[in-house]
Amino acid sequence: MAFNVADLFEHTADAVPERTALICGEDRRSYAQLDERSTRLAHTLADQGIVPGDHVGIYALNSIQWIEAVLAITKIRAVPVNVNYRYVEEELRYLFDNADLKGLFYGEEFGPRVAAVKDTLPLLKTLVMIEDGAGENQADLDPILFEDAVAKGSPVRDFPKRSGDDQVIIYTGGTTGMPKGVMWRSEDIFFALMGGVDPFTREPVKSEFEQSEKAKASAGQLVFMTPPPLMHGAAFVASLMNLFQGNVNVLVRKFEPEEIWRLIERHKVNSLLIVGDAMARPLIETLEALEARGEKLDLSSFLSLSSSAAVFSPAVKERFLDRFPNLVITDSIGATESGFNGLVTVSKENLGNKAGGPRVTPGKDTVVLDENLRPVEPGSGVVGKVARGGNIPLGYYKDPEKTAQTWVTAADGKRYAMPGDFAMVEADGTITLLGRGSVCINTGGEKVYPEEVEQALKAHPAVFDAVVVGVPDERWGQKVAAVVEFRPGCDATLEELREHSRAHIAGYKLPRELHVVDRIERSPSGKPDYPWAKTLAESGNYRVAVSP
């Protein structure tokens, strides 16, 4: 039995055709509409010469058309490839070439960038433009308009039989280097990231029809909202998971905190997905400000908050629980290269350590391996790397060297994905995440993981956001430098921040430099821009105005 992305969606569309699948602004689709439109679009792609195995990119802001494009690509067994809409021309040229794109869906506003690089990409033949009224004349590109592509395609689902081996490629920038394409088999990504395994019970789905049959048997639908960019893994996989399960998925084009709360009220959203503090802090502070002004929003439908892919500080979790005492908060760890690695349900009594990453129950097939690729003993205090076996990616596209570094064969003979996240195994078997090794600071032989220092700093009432990096030091090799964004009207000295943090982390981990900025640079997914912070810290500037 094959678990294929397109098949799983079609099963749900057949089971609950009239139910709402997607909402974005005033645009919405039922499952039947979404299926027919993506089927038509798939036929148009095939008519343009896209064949099974061809790579087709999606370069656009969040929209229903983004999801329709993914479904269309997978329906004809081609390979969807995400494109970061923040990339400049040089980065786009690299990604389009590295990914061997044969086709591209792009938002109208990004047309000029596509035009600037297309002539150097002989493989890229098929262009489909998602119209949004934000672009310039596209005559030099001669794209097919998205709605024309839908209109001209056949609505008949007469596609060749699909396979669990059909691929999805997710490009990830990580914390360093050029973007790398992670190759997932359809079946593997379903079980690792798209709901194929229950994160609480660890029980896998046994039939490709199991989720669609449950959706048909249910009396109603859950309403999920996924504000992060679809171009990143978290929102992309969550959106498809919701479709497989027959839920309503609410998308937003851009992250605007006040609009998020108003949409939660309007659509009676039950569950919200965020990416750590970069989204959580603005959300809770905006809500607090709205309510302080006397605004009364009906948020009674809001039942759960899920965070992944970035640090979600205990202090911020506590503010959500102060406002929503019965809110179920889950904090999970994982990576594009490995899939879901673990989860913790947060409560007032279990907010997490103010220094260090989340402490989670490991997911199915997740272990921590030591330097000899053997499992770390619980409670030993040994720092190892998080690794995941089972349903994991094939590797990086066209990069065998980095593939060999990230996917390893351990002492037990099993193949594991090991992206580089350091962790310890506690006595009870839970995992405490310490941070990514590529940004680890070595000061006098002691290892300092930026995330634990960042969490300690962000627990200070004056600090809105912080990124920590290592800078050269004649005596210690490296010293800890903090780049900090204060709350409006607030300030603190380096000594005040050190004194506050001393209660949470060891003395050698305390920052020895403070660089104050008016805005911390982060990716749209909420991840810290460590190269930016390191360049800033090494510049010697201690008060820096960051342009919007």
Language-model features, listed with the residues they occupy:
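Flexible, low-complexity linker/hinge segments
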Residues: 1-3, 135-166
